[in-house]
């Protein structure tokens, strides 16, 4: 059930566009922070292992975002018909300066994870930020 809830949230998120770019002070520039939440529970039982995740990151994610990304270990939870369920999750954070140009790459990563690990959804959020180094 939690997968269907996340799928619904993903669908809603796909309809929303990030807000207007913030007014940034130099050297920062307007950008978009994209967060993808990859649940690690497999539908038939078990979990996406650290080795499986590392392979996915290396062969699917990194080639699409070679300029950099961050991965955090988080504990996700959702409420379904049977109550609250908890799941270990990988949070992928990517900051991009041209969000429309990266939408296909994001979609490819999400589709690859869903296919490779039998997931129903990957939750996604986006927000305008100021970024730079």
Task: Please provide the spans of the model-predicted regions.
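Bacterial signal peptide processing site
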Residues: 16-18
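Terminal, regulation- and interaction-focused segments at domain boundaries
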Residues: 31-50, 93
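Short beta-strand/turn micro-motifs at beta-sheet edges
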Residues: 21-26, 78-82
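Positively charged n-region of N-terminal signal peptides that target proteins for export
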Residues: 1-4
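Mature extracytoplasmic domains of secretory-pathway proteins
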Residues: 52-89, 95-101
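C-terminal motif of bacterial Sec signal peptides marking the signal peptidase cleavage site
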Residues: 11-14
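Structural recognition of the beta-strand scaffold that forms the well-ordered cores
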Residues: 35, 70-71, 123
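Helix-rich interaction surfaces within compact, conserved domain-sized segments
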Residues: 84-133
């Amino acid at each position: 059930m939690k997968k269907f809830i996340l799928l619904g949230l993903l669908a809603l998120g796909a309809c929303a566009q990030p807000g207007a770019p913030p007014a940034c002070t130099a050297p920062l520039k307007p950008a978009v922070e994209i967060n993808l939440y990859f649940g690690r529970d497999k539908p038939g039982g078990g979990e996406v292992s650290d080795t499986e995740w590392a392979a996915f990151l290396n062969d699917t994610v990194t080639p699409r975002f070679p300029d950099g990304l961050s991965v955090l270990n988080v504990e996700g939870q959702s409420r379904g018909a049977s109550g609250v369920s908890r799941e270990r999750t990988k949070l992928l954070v990517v900051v991009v300066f041209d969000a429309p140009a990266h939408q296909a790459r994001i979609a490819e990563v999400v589709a690859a994870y869903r296919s490779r690990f039998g997931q129903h959804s990957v939750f996604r959020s986006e927000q305008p930020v100021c970024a730079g180094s």
